[in-house]
Amino acid sequence: LSDVALGVGVQRSNQDFKNRRKQTRDIMRSYGDDKDYSLGGHSLGGSHALNNMSQSKSIRDRVKSVHIFNPGYTLPFHNSIKVNKETKKELDKKINIHRVKGDIVSAHANKETAFGNVFEYKADKDADLLDKHTLDNFTNTEL
């Protein structure tokens, strides 16, 4: 249901998104404000991070950086997480959206994002749709 909620831009009322935001705030409060917090996620996890940053000032104030990978990002989701100009300016400094060209889950992120910086990577030319979405695109490296 969370995937559907973000697909149509109603994740604010989705219990999974609400729970994730509360859990994130609770974890940060338990460790204190003197820590350097960062958020990360892939696919739905990346969408959770974007939603948390747009919806919670207490999370936003504590987080120093965000790196997300092929987040679920649709036009309705985009419209639902828009923030005011001042907040956008703050989030543009913290949020980095990494996506593979041709990934359909993060497809709208190549057009525009509500905030943050987009880094786009090329997939192997023989990659199928699942290959383009996998986190392996960002973790497989030659040693």
Where on the chain are the PLM-derived regions?
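A conserved cap/lid and substrate-binding interface adjacent to the catalytic center
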Residues: L1-L39, S56, R60-S65, S80
